[in-house]
């Protein structure tokens, strides 16, 4: 959520920055609501002061032996007027907050202006895509050859966009997540966490999934006797529970940065993606991901974004997977991000790069919703922290990249050297 003072005092400047990301801010409506808020605020404060003054007069009149009934009736009337004024003000403030919750973050100045993914800017490339001297098989064909990917079974169990993994393919999927966690915890300084896969609505508001993206979530539906369960949804990413661990907390600045990682399944309805990537593991309703989250001082967040992106890149480099790094344009960034890097891995069967990691600086956008603050050791003042999140990496898409980039002419899949310790020294699948 943006700073209310910024919306209140600099609406035109905010509107100009939001226009860069294709969002039209209704400045006239905001101004009208703000003027109304000022009037109601003054009226409420005046009624409160008048009621306090009259209440004090009751005690004085009583001490003088005067009839206090007229004053008491007047105080009661003022109390009713005050309650009505407070209710009207609260309703208006709720309307303003509801509007604020739908406004995306401001883009950082260095983010390229653009409309969609076609305007993203490539920053760098690593590795050279392999040249094959045989016909390339895609990961679905390879998975079926080794009885490792069973989409038909998943359709029977659940429906489309799910998979059953088996045998050595399932083992490699597990090995990838373990390798990523070990790398981030042992070399990159993250602490490993195990988090709930169901979270409440306060948690989803904190990281910005609600109210705007309710349709992208899988919500629980209560049985009649279990009404309390209606307040849950499955996590779309471990960013949600990890970041909310600092909700309503005040952290000493010398405890920052806080760097957390977790391996979880992620659940997304993929609303709006009908017909896209219907074959294989690229776009699933349920997929695994190793997530990175950092909680930092405001002045450190841009450097932390570079560091975090480097941590995701290291996974790809150690796996020997060619990739490119791009900076998202204003029109393609996520709702809460001020700056985002995407890493796209080479997928041979598609002859293109596909997103495998997204690393974002969110500034204080989530922290304001969560009321997550840090305290200076010198003057004890508090301020909002900055939060960052990144994929390190999406496990299923990494599996796709490994299967396709490491395939052999006879259909076998070479196991990358860094994964062999997790697979009992296995060199090839098949």
UniProtKB/Swiss-Prot annotation:
Keywords: Aminoacyl-tRNA synthetase, ATP-binding, Cytoplasm, Ligase, Nucleotide-binding, Protein biosynthesis. ATP binds at residues 268-270, 355-358. It is found in: Cytoplasm. One of its GO terms (biological process) is seryl-tRNA aminoacylation. Pathway: Aminoacyl-tRNA biosynthesis; selenocysteinyl-tRNA(Sec) biosynthesis; L-seryl-tRNA(Sec) from L-serine and tRNA(Sec): step 1/1. L-serine binds at residues 237-239, 291, 391. SUPFAM superfamilies: Class II aaRS and biotin synthetases, tRNA-binding arm. The keyword Transmembrane helix does not apply. GO terms for cellular component: cytoplasm. It catalyses: tRNA(Ser) + L-serine + ATP = L-seryl-tRNA(Ser) + AMP + diphosphate + H(+); tRNA(Sec) + L-serine + ATP = L-seryl-tRNA(Sec) + AMP + diphosphate + H(+). It comes from the Bacteria. InterPro entries: aa-tRNA-synt_IIb, aa-tRNA-synth_II, aa-tRNA-synth_II/BPL/LPL, Ser-tRNA-ligase_type_1, Ser-tRNA-synth_1_N, SerRS_1_N_sf, SerRS_core, tRNA-bd_arm. Its EC number is 6.1.1.11. Belongs to the class-II aminoacyl-tRNA synthetase family. Type-1 seryl-tRNA synthetase subfamily. Catalyzes the attachment of serine to tRNA(Ser). Is also able to aminoacylate tRNA(Sec) with serine, to form the misacylated tRNA L-seryl-tRNA(Sec), which will be further converted into selenocysteinyl-tRNA(Sec). Consists of two distinct domains, a catalytic core and a N-terminal extension that is involved in tRNA binding. Homodimer. The tRNA molecule binds across the dimer. This is Serine--tRNA ligase.
């Amino acid at each position: 959520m943006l700073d209310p003072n910024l919306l209140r005092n600099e609406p035109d400047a905010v509107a100009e920055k939001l226009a860069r990301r294709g969002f039209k801010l209704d400045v006239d409506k905001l101004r009208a609501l703000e003027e109304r808020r000022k009037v109601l605020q003054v009226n409420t404060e005046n009624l409160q002061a008048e009621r306090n003054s009259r209440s004090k007069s009751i005690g004085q009149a009583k001490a003088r032996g005067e009839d206090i009934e007229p004053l008491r009736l007047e105080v009661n009337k003022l109390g009713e007027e005050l309650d009505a004024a407070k209710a009207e003000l609260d309703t208006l403030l709720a309307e303003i907050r509801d509007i604020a919750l739908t406004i995306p973050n401001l883009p950082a100045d260095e983010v390229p202006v653009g409309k969609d993914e076609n305007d993203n800017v490539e920053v760098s490339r690593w590795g050279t895509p392999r040249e094959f001297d045989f016909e390339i098989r895609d990961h679905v064909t390879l998975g079926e050859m080794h009885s490792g990917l069973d989409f038909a079974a998943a359709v029977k169990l659940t429906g489309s966009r799910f998979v059953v993994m088996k045998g050595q393919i399932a083992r490699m999927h597990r090995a990838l997540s373990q390798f990523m966690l070990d790398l981030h915890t042992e070399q990159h300084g993250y602490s490993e966490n195990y988090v709930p896969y169901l979270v409440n609505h306060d948690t989803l508001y904190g990281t910005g999934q609600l109210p705007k993206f309710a349709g992208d979530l899988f919500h629980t539906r209560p049985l009649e006797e279990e009404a309390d369960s209606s307040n849950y949804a499955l996590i779309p990413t471990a960013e949600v529970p990890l970041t909310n661990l600092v909700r309503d907390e005040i952290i000493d600045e010398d405890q920052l940065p806080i760097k957390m990682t977790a391996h979880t399944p992620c659940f997304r309805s993929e609303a709006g993606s009908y017909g896209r990537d219907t074959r294989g593991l690229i776009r699933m309703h349920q997929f695994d991901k190793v997530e990175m989250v950092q909680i930092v001082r405001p002045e450190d967040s841009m450097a932390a974004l570079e560091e975090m992106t480097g941590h995701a890149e290291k996974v790809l480099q150690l796996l020997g997977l060619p990739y490119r790094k791009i900076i998202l344009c204003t029109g393609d960034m996520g709702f809460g991000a001020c700056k985002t890097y995407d890493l796209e891995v080479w997928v041979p069967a598609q002859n293109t790069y596909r997103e495998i990691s997204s690393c974002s600086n969110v500034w204080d956008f989530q922290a304001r919703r969560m009321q997550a603050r840090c305290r200076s050791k010198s003057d004890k003042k508090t301020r909002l922290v900055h939060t960052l999140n990144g994929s390190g990496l999406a496990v299923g898409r990494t599996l796709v990249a490994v299967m396709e980039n490491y395939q052999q002419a006879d259909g076998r899949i070479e196991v990358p050297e860094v994964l062999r310790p997790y697979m009992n020294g296995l060199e090839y699948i098949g």
